[in-house]
Amino acid sequence: MVQIVISSTGAEGLAEWVLMELQGEIEARYSTGLAGNLLGDLHYTTEGIPVLIVGHHILYGKIIHLEKPFAVLVKHTPGKQDCDELGRETGTQYLVTALIKNKILFKTRPKPIITNVPKKV
């Protein structure tokens, strides 16, 4: 299972992320990996159905509301500049940067996108 996070702005001041769940594996074309690279295009139909286009393949998904939302936390460990009035270091703090309330599930196999196949080679 591959999980991908998409960022958007929320109404409460926190970013609201959407979790994308894909079945199977996604392999990078080169050995550099997928981090920081464009995976594909996410679109929505007029009915609100999510459509993911990856290369020459198309996937149809559905939006699922999570019963228990996830919080995205950033760990902040104290340093020399993080001291209280008495010079003692403050403890480790966690900052909530985003909430994940929905996920997009792509559970079907990708369908190839074929356009204009020539009859003569």
From Swiss-Prot:
Keyword line: Cell cycle, DNA replication, DNA-binding, Nucleus
Location in the cell: Nucleus
One GO process term, biological-process aspect: positive regulation of DNA-directed DNA polymerase activity
GO molecular function: DNA binding
Main localization of the protein described in the UniProt heading: nucleus
Function: Chromosome cohesion factor involved in sister chromatid cohesion and fidelity of chromosome transmission. Component of one of the cell nuclear antigen loader complexes, CTF18-replication factor C (CTF18-RFC), which consists of CTF18, CTF8, DSCC1, RFC2, RFC3, RFC4 and RFC5. The CTF18-RFC complex binds to single-stranded and primed DNAs and has weak ATPase activity that is stimulated the presence of primed DNA, replication protein A (RPA) and proliferating cell nuclear antigen (PCNA). The CTF18-RFC complex catalyzes the ATP-dependent loading of PCNA onto primed and gapped DNA.
Known partners and oligomeric status: Component of the CTF18-RFC complex, which consists of CTF18, CTF8, DSCC1, RFC2, RFC3, RFC4 and RFC5. The CTF18-RFC complex does not interact with the Rad9/Rad1/Hus1 complex. The CTF18-RFC complex interacts with POLH. CTF18/CTF8/DSCC1 associate with PCNA. CTF8 exists as a dimer with DSCC1.
Family named by the database record: Belongs to the CTF8 family.
Name of the molecule in the record: Chromosome transmission fidelity protein 8 homolog
Lineage: Eukaryota, Metazoa, Chordata, Craniata, Vertebrata
